[in-house]
């Protein structure tokens, strides 16, 4: 039971997700991953702090694959807490407007809304208004994310295409392709090189 009295019960599978959020009064919300867009946990579910940040210039021209570094998560309650911690890091220590990523990927195979589709992230200077940043939670220098996380990210990209958040001829790049950084980690980078639209 969290601080707002919301009980989050997650039943997660690679290709099927049911999310039941119970509040007082009793409200039930069910999300099924029958489409590429449905496996996204909204900011309200992980109790994001409210912010007002610059807007994206949509449709985006780039997908930037990032890793957050630090710890990862494999259970949904653990991932929600980790996303909270990452948001606090950005706001309180890095003086950012909000969490630096549009979306985050847990090793529970679930996508967590960061600033979402319409708001700029803050990790790719010069690209923040035209790129969607997808961050895998963890460090992936030697070991890549698991299959569930990789599939979730690919579904998210398909969702962005389906909903018109990406131009048809978008480019997919690693964080290290545009910033001097170890992100997204060599193990993850080796995988995304084989993804559609990759551009070194």
What annotation goes with each model-predicted range?
Residues 2-68, 106-122, 127-200:
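Basic/polar, cationic surfaces and motifs that engage anionic cell-wall
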Residues 57-91:
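Active-site acidic/histidine clusters and adjacent loop/turn architecture
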Residues 86, 90-99, 107:
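Glycine-/small-residue-enriched capping loops at alpha/beta junctions
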Residues 37, 53, 73, 79-80, ...:
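Cysteine-centric signal of extracytoplasmic or virion-exposed proteins
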């Amino acid at each position: 039971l969290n601080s707002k009295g919301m009980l989050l019960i997650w039943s997660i599978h690679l290709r099927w997700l049911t999310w039941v959020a119970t509040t007082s009064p009793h409200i039930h919300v069910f999300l099924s991953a029958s489409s590429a867009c449905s496996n996204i946990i909204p900011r309200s579910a992980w109790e994001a702090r409210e912010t007002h940040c610059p807007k994206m210039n949509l449709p985006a021209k780039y997908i930037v694959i990032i890793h957050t570094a630090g710890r990862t998560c494999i259970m949904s309650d653990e991932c929600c807490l980790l996303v909270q911690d990452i948001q606090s890091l950005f706001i309180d220590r890095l003086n950012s407007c909000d969490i630096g990523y549009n979306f985050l990927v847990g090793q529970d195979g679930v996508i967590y809304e960061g600033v979402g589709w319409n708001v700029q992230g803050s990790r790719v200077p010069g690209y923040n208004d035209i790129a969607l940043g997808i961050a895998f939670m963890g460090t992936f220098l030697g070991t890549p994310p698991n299959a569930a996380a990789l599939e979730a990210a690919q579904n998210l990209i398909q969702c962005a295409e389906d909903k018109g958040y990406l131009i048809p001829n978008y480019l997919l790049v690693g964080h290290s392709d545009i910033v001097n950084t170890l992100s997204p980690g060599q193990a993850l980078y080796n995988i995304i090189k084989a993804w559609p639209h990759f551009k070194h």
